[in-house]
């Protein structure tokens, strides 16, 4: 009986100590990504990944300054390109608030697990992220100013969520995209944005 309590106490102490030692980065050290663009160059076999991130910085007094930054990088994998972006920015990338993923038609021809799994497994990507494609490259789509907002991913997310079903508008989340890709038919429908 005493050994059971000792083991329980040792586990509790270990969890408390290591829970205090793990550093949680502040918002000023993180790049909160709102939208990500994935393009694939078939000739070089590289991914070009673009992100639109919100950078929160402090300014004079108690006010904080927010800016939107678009950054692109190439890599052999999506995770490799995101690592290059993190080094360029000097910040930790967080995809937990990513609203929209712009995927080029060349990237859609690849294995869909190769597109989705690195983001969900390594970067805590939300399953409710919306997939879209369009007539422009993903980096151009991210840098566009659409509607009345500064952030095109935020505007598109609001439009697709609020207007779903009207005028034939559809919304395909990352969860739906992967489920349909792994189904027997292996067919997907995602919104095509013309800007």
Protein language model regions, located:
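Membrane-proximal alpha-helical signals and transmembrane carboxylates
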Residues: 1-195
């Amino acid at each position: 009986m005493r050994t059971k309590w000792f083991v329980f106490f040792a586990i509790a102490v270990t969890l408390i100590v290591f829970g205090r030692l793990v550093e949680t980065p502040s918002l000023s050290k993180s790049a909160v990504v709102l939208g990500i663009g994935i393009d694939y160059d078939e000739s070089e076999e590289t991914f070009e990944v673009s992100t639109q991130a919100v950078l929160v910085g402090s300014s004079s007094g108690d006010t904080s300054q927010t800016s939107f930054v678009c950054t692109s990088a190439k890599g052999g994998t999506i995770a490799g390109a995101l690592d290059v972006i993190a080094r360029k920015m000097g910040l930790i990338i967080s995809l937990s608030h990513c609203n929209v993923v712009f995927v080029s038609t060349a990237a859609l021809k690849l294995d869909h697990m190769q597109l989705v799994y690195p983001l969900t497994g390594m970067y805590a990507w939300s399953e409710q992220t919306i997939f879209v494609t369009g007539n422009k490259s993903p980096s151009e789509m991210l840098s566009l100013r659409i509607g009345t907002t500064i952030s095109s991913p935020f505007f598109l997310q609001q439009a697709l969520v609020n207007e779903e079903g009207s005028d034939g508008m559809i919304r395909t989340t990352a969860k739906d995209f992967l489920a349909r890709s792994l189904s027997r038919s292996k067919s997907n429908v995602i919104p095509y944005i013309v800007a």
